[in-house]
Amino acid sequence: MSKLSDNHSSASEGEKEAGDLESGPTAISSEPSFDDADRDPNLITWDGPKDPENPKNWPKGLRWKNTWTVSLFVFISPVSSSMIAPAMSDLAKSLGMHAEIEIYLSLSIFILAYSIGPIFFGPASELYGRVRLLQISNVWYLAWNLGCGFATTKGQLFAFRFLAGIGGSAPLAIGGGAISDMWTAEERGKAMGVYTLGPLLGPVVGPIAGGFIAEYSTWRWVFWSTSAAALAVQVVGFFWLQECHPGTLLRKRRDRLAKETGNENLHTAEKVETLGYKLLHAFERPVKMFTTQPIVFCMAIYMAYLFGISYLMFATFPEIWTVVYHESPGIGGLNYLSIAIGSFIGLFFNLKLVDRIYRSLKARNNGVGKPEYRMPSLAVGSVISTIGLFWYGWSIGNTHWIMPNIGALIFAMGTISCLQGMQTYIVDSYQTYAASAMAACAVLRSLCGFGFPLFAPYMYNSLGYGWGTSLLAFITMVVGWGAPFAFWHFGPRLRAMSKYASG
């Protein structure tokens, strides 16, 4: 067993950097050092820093294939979240919805379920792995989403939408951890950009298709078509998706070696914990981090705010184009392309610049990287988002239809830059506890995505599109313009004071 000890003793820089191993509420308790392994010949870790089974050492092509596959799972659920927007009026007539809040609830209740999923799916992926959870949750989502198409009462629709949303929340809860499993800090920006694109583009692509489905078919086909797409993603995942959670891979290695050697004393560095114990801490740690960590608190608030505005925009788009600009549902749905194009432009520049800026600033700092080197993306994105909101709000109904689209495009450009900057900043700041920090963000983000569309019609009825959207823009200025500079200066001190932060 001495060879086993030598080969599996190294915590390795890869694993050390995989402080991102935590994808749920309970992390590996401590990273084993070389001395730990020397004292414990039964400890199973990676075979040094270059272990090919460590996901961070996989060939780049394999890592990108896994990243894109995870992103497909992340993409399909947000498509379903907003695809019914162009069909809400037909759906309301069919199921007897009369109050505005009921109509918008049919869209946003799906997002409410997103606040529950991360609490369960994060810790469950610690025990059962990323792949199994992604596939099982997708089947759950598919079944209930299919049921929405057969709903005969508004109560059934609300219940089925909520249950479908719970399954659809799993990729959003697990995806960020899966990305950090495979990529180092210097590489992570591009991968996180691809991952971020799913939640941002999904709600945009959905209404484009939903508009034509609503115009030429019935609202029921909105649900049936997304279920067919989810089935296609399931098939792709079956063939392409590979387990990348280091803790799960090391447990499999331990089981294989125990079978080969007959040594049942072999073990990994993880604590053996039940799902119930993990669930308890899954709820506890995100709450603690949200209430005690200024970085998590501020990033969660701003991320949730931008997410809420995005869903407010998705929900109110159909009325703007069909009522104000007198377009058909199908043509009106095409206006969502402005958000998609803006997202692509924002992602393109971030992919080109975010990791380059990080490496440049790291080189100037004697090769030492800091999470604060993600702040330029947030600063620039916040300014762009604010400009987009003002442009969008004051051009509705007062100018040619292209002008609100340009405003929405500018807002989307800035938003994806902000989201990517905030997500990578949190992952870099709380590597070991990144998933708990992201879970706190996800819960608040989902609550805003649920709530903002519900007050949107009342806000616009009272203030109009110009002043209503300007109110949102002024809040973006206050929060988004100041936060990047505050964390650039005070972030290192806040992290030094934190028991959760790294670096």
Swiss-Prot record:
MF terms in GO: transmembrane transporter activity
Gene Ontology cellular component terms for the protein in this record: membrane
Entry keyword annotation includes Coiled coil: no
Protein location: Membrane
Main location: membrane
Keyword Metal-binding belongs to the record: no
Gene Ontology biological process terms in this record: viridicatumtoxin biosynthetic process
Biotechnology: Viridicatumtoxin and its derivative, viridicatumtoxin B, exhibit anti-methicillin-resistant Staphylococcus aureus (anti-MRSA) activity. Moreover, viridicatumtoxin and a C2 acetyl analog, spirohexaline, have been demonstrated to inhibit bacterial undecaprenyl diphosphate synthase, a potential new target for antibiotic development.
Membrane topology per record: Multi-pass membrane protein
Positions of transmembrane segments: 68-88, 101-121, 133-153, 162-182, 194-214, 221-241, 295-315, 329-349, 377-397, 401-421, 432-454, 471-491
UniProt superkingdom: Eukaryota
Location of the region described as Disordered in the Swiss-Prot/TrEMBL record: 1-59
Residues bearing attached sugar chains per UniProt: N7
A Pfam family of this chain: MFS_1
InterPro entries: MFS (IPR011701), MFS_dom (IPR020846), MFS_trans_sf (IPR036259)
Gene3D superfamilies: MFS general substrate transporter like domains (1.20.1250.20)
Alphabetically ordered keywords of this record: Glycoprotein, Membrane, Transmembrane, Transmembrane helix, Transport
Family: Belongs to the major facilitator superfamily.
Function: Efflux pump; part of the gene cluster that mediates the biosynthesis of viridicatumtoxin, a tetracycline-like fungal meroterpenoid with a unique, fused spirobicyclic ring system.
Protein name: Efflux pump vrtL
Gene: vrtL
